[in-house]
């Protein structure tokens, strides 16, 4: 299945809200309109610095289970400024969720 961006938001925003994610950004083939049935879903999530790796992995598991697809769920707190992933996020990123 190829989800629309709105479908991804609808499925994941309750998880992000419950788990206190600060911001989640979709990037990769889904934002470029190149996604196929075999495409994974690329998401970078910014979380509180105090969040444990176990809690972050729990969020990733919930996201994967909700979407039923392979997901590259990245810890955005450690993305290198102006590195490859940072540039991809700036170029192609679509905001899925932002805590108010």
Give the ranges of each region predicted by the language model.
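Short, conserved active-site loops that position catalytic residues or coordinate cofactors/metal ions
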Residues: 39-41
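Catalytic core of pol beta-like nucleotidyltransferases
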Residues: 1-23, 32-37, 49-100
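Conserved H-loop
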Residues: 29
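Short hydrophobic/aromatic beta-strand micro-patches
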Residues: 44-48
């Amino acid at each position: 299945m190829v989800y629309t961006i709105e479908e991804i938001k609808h499925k994941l925003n309750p998880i992000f809200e419950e788990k206190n994610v600060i911001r989640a950004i979709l990037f990769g083939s889904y934002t470029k309109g190149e996604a196929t049935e075999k495409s994974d879903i690329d998401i970078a999530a910014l979380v509180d610095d105090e969040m444990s790796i176990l809690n972050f992995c729990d969020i990733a598991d919930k996201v994967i289970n909700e979407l039923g697809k392979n997901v590259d769920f990245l810890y955005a707190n450690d993305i290198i400024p102006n590195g490859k992933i940072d540039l991809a996020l700036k170029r192609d990123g679509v905001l899925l969720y932002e805590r108010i």
